[in-house]
Amino acid sequence: MGVARRLASILRRHRRIALDASVFIYQLEANPKYLPQTKTIFSWLELPESSAATSTITMTELLVMPYRERDAQLVDDFNGLLSTYPNLDWIPPSLEIADLAARIRALHGLKTPDALQAATAVNAQATAFITNDKVFERINAFDTLLLDRLL
């Protein structure tokens, strides 16, 4: 079974997934190593039965490079592209998420941005978290799907 078919099968088994910033970065950069996976994920996001979430922290991470390079067009392109997926919820930090992130950080030793991503996934009731960072495997509240393992 090919990478795309295997990943599509995995996605269908989860009622809601959460996405780390790396998924968006690889897609927007058209990273050749991960493009089959990210294309599958973003195609899946267009299906009516899909449901996904990410923290607005993701947008912060994505926009650093275009702002650093003073590329207003790329900022607009990112904002336009990323806000158009119908089944992707952009979840801002709340006091509840901040509290959960602090607990995750204390228990699992994650850095604050990662703890916020994990807390957002838990708060959004995601059953899987797609990333390329092994640190998320410390958290048992969801299945961590590493893009490197989906090659």
Model features per residue range: what roles?
Residues 1-54, 67-76, 80, 134, ...:
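Short, well-structured N-terminal submotif of metal-dependent ribonuclease cores
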Residues 48-49, 125, 140:
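Glycine-centered loop/turn motif at secondary-structure junctions
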Residues 78-100, 106-107, 113, 137-151:
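Short acidic, glycine/proline-enriched helix-loop-strand junctions
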